């Protein structure tokens, strides 16, 4: 049931189909579950054992490899080339590390390593671009959620410990190898590298009987540093204060605005979650690097389990992030481009019409983000409007070849562990 993950998202059409996938349902379900589990908790020392101990052992080994791979001396503007050596080392070691972890705790699921190794290896930035961003952070979430689907059943303290250890390692990677932001919006983005960390950290402050820190205290670097050891929001913001100079309002205006305009942590969490769905899960530049297997994150419709449309643009096509841009290049508003539709064991070339300028498919923002509730059981509320009925309308008919995929009954059983685990 497990298979080598493959690329399915090649343009914003693929990003549109991703919104209907079982994969995004599981990822969103994991975020909702973990934000609930960590609510009102601090990062605390744990007696490491079981799956948690195994995960931390893997992260410790990857951290040790950083020590064994020092940065190359000399000024570097776009990342240190030693990072590529580090990535080569982890590519060699991760399969064995995961086999030890899975064989110790889930021996009957050893075949899952073929998928799990992809998500873990992609959790630490790009060896090609020497950068790190929210897509890599998403890959680590996918790794943790995959272990949860196998039966790890993490509680809130364990979730916090694992993510805190992960962020410590990533902070070291960014500083050691001067990793660039991946797809950053600059000062107009939430953060150069992270987003999920702020959701988890804000949830830690929610519903406390005695609140040690209010949102308006975020502009106090001394207080932020004080709580950076127990709160992931403060840990991440303290990292920002470490790597950036100047006024808070100038280098991180969005975080500064949160500290000035949002009064409660519950509202901070709600706003960050809504923003995450729009700016991470719904953005082609981010999710194009998320690949799909047949076990943990299958490329199938979450409603009926059928395979989603699957195609790849020809290499000679000038790919853009926005199909509307391509349409505007044509005098009549349409043109025909060549796409390769893929199915197992069969590749055919098909002519399809390019989307017209008014097709409504542009940057992939939901027309009704409020309807995308934080409960994964309500995913049927997603917009199914047709062309011209909102920005999330499906693209015009393209004669897409529907491919058949193997049944994933076991995969659904794994997913049910993730979705239905009660709050600890």
UniProtKB/Swiss-Prot annotation:
It holds the Pfam family PTPA. One of its GO terms (biological process) is mitotic spindle organization. Residues 364-386, 404-424 have a biased composition (Polar residues). One of its GO terms (molecular function) is protein tyrosine phosphatase activator activity. Keywords: Cytoplasm, Isomerase, Nucleus, Rotamase. The keyword Isomerase applies. PPIases accelerate the folding of proteins. It catalyzes the cis-trans isomerization of proline imidic peptide bonds in oligopeptides. Acts as a regulatory subunit for PP2A-like phosphatases modulating their activity or substrate specificity, probably by inducing a conformational change in the catalytic subunit, a direct target of the PPIase. Can reactivate inactive phosphatase PP2A-phosphatase methylesterase complexes (PP2Ai) in presence of ATP and Mg(2+) by dissociating the inactive form from the complex. This is Serine/threonine-protein phosphatase 2A activator 1. It comes from Candida glabrata (strain ATCC 2001 / BCRC 20586 / JCM 3761 / NBRC 0622 / NRRL Y-65 / CBS 138).
């Amino acid at each position: 049931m497990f298979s080598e993950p493959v690329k399915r998202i090649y343009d914003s059409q693929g990003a549109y189909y991703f919104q209907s996938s079982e994969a995004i349902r599981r990822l969103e379900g994991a975020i909702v579950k973990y934000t609930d589990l960590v609510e009102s908790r601090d990062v605390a020392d744990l007696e490491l054992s079981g799956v948690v101990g195994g995960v931390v052992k893997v992260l410790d080994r990857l951290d040790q490899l950083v020590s064994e791979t020092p940065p190359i001396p000399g000024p570097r503007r776009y990342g240190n080339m030693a990072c590529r050596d580090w990535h080569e080392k982890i590519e060699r070691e991760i399969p064995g590390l995961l086999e030890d972890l899975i064989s110790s705790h889930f021996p009957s699921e050893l075949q899952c390593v073929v998928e799990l190794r992809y998500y873990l290896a992609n959790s630490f930035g790009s060896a090609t671009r020497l950068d790190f961003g929210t897509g890599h952070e998403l890959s680590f979430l996918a790794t943790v959620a995959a272990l949860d689907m196998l039966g790890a059943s993490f509680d809130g303290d364990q979730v916090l410990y694992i993510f805190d250890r992960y962020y410590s390692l990533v902070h070291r990677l960014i500083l050691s190898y001067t990793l660039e932001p991946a797809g950053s919006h600059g000062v107009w983005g939430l953060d150069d590298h992270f987003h999920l960390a702020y959701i988890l950290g804000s949830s830690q402050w929610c519903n406390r009987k005695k609140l040690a820190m209010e949102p308006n205290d975020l502009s106090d670097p001394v207080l932020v540093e004080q709580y950076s050891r127990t709160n992931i929001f403060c840990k991440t913001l303290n990292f920002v204060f470490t790597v950036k100079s100047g006024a808070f309002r100038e280098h991180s205006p969005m975080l500064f605005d949160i500290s000035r305009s949002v009064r409660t942590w519950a509202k901070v969490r709600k706003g960050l979650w809504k923003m995450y769905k729009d700016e991470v899960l719904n953005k082609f530049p981010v999710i194009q690097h998320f690949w799909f297997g047949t076990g943990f994150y299958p490329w199938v419709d979450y409603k009926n389990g059928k395979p989603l449309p699957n195609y790849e643009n020809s290499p000679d096509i000038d790919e853009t992030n926005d199909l509307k841009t391509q349409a505007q290049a044509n005098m009549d508003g349409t043109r025909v481009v060549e796409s390769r539709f893929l199915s197992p064991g069969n590749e055919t070339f098909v002519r399809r019409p390019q989307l017209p300028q008014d097709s409504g498919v542009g940057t992939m923002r939901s027309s009704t983000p409020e309807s995308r509730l934080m409960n994964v059981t309500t995913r049927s509320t997603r917009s199914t409007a047709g062309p011209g009925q909102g920005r999330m309308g499906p693209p015009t008919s393209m004669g897409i070849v529907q491919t058949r995929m193997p049944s994933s009954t076991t995969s659904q059983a794994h997913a049910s562990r993730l979705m239905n685990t009660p709050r600890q």
